[in-house]
C-alpha cells in the first residue's frame, strides 16, 4: 500500500483548522498531513484504512487520538484498540504498527522533526 505523508505545516498560527473538512475531502487509503506546530510539537491529521509497517521512533514519543472509526496499535505481545474519543501514547523506542480495519480519522501529536515512517 502507498502511504501519502505530508510533512509540510499546512496552517499558520491564528488560522482556523477544519480537520473535518480535510478528512471528508481525503480519498487516499493511508494519508496524513501536518496541521500545525505547537511549541516543539506537531499536530497531524490522519485518515487511515489498512495497515502501516512495524517501526519505532528512537527519540520521540507518539500520541494518537481517534476522532472517528476504529484504530489498532500492535505492540510486542498485545494490541491496543482505540475507539472515538480515546487516545494512546507510544513511548520512544517501542516497536509498533498501526492498523485501521475501517476508514478511521486520527489526530497525532509528535515532536517536530519526527520521521513518520520510523527511524
Regions found by a protein language model. Give the residues of each.
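Ligand-binding loop in jelly-roll beta-barrel domains
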Residues: 92-119
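Short strand-coil-strand connectors
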Residues: 39, 74-78, 101
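A cytosolic small-molecule/anion-sensing beta-strand core signal
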Residues: 39, 67-68, 83-84, 102, ...
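Short, conserved beta-strand element in jelly-roll/cupin
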Residues: 47-49, 57-74, 109
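Conserved short histidine dyad/triad with adjacent acidic residue
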Residues: 28-29, 42-58
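Short acidic-glycine-tyrosine-enriched beta hairpin
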Residues: 76-92
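A short, N-terminal "cap"/entry segment at the start of jelly-roll beta-barrel domains
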Residues: 1-44
Amino acid at each position: 500500500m502507498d502511504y501519502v505523508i505530508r510533512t509540510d505545516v499546512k496552517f499558520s498560527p491564528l488560522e482556523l483548522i477544519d480537520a473535518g473538512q480535510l478528512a471528508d475531502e481525503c480519498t487516499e487509503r493511508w494519508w496524513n498531513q501536518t496541521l500545525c506546530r505547537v511549541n516543539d510539537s506537531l499536530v497531524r491529521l490522519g485518515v487511515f484504512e489498512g495497515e502501516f509497517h512495524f517501526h519505532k521512533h528512537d527519540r520521540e514519543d507518539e500520541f494518537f487520538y481517534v476522532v472517528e472509526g476504529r484504530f489498532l496499535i500492535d505492540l510486542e505481545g498485545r494490541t491496543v484498540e482505540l475507539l472515538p474519543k480515546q487516545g494512546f501514547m507510544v513511548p520512544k523506542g517501542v516497536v509498533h504498527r498501526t492498523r485501521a480495519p475501517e476508514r478511521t480519522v486520527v489526530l497525532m501529536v509528535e515532536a517536530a522533526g519526527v520521521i513518520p515512517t520510523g527511524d
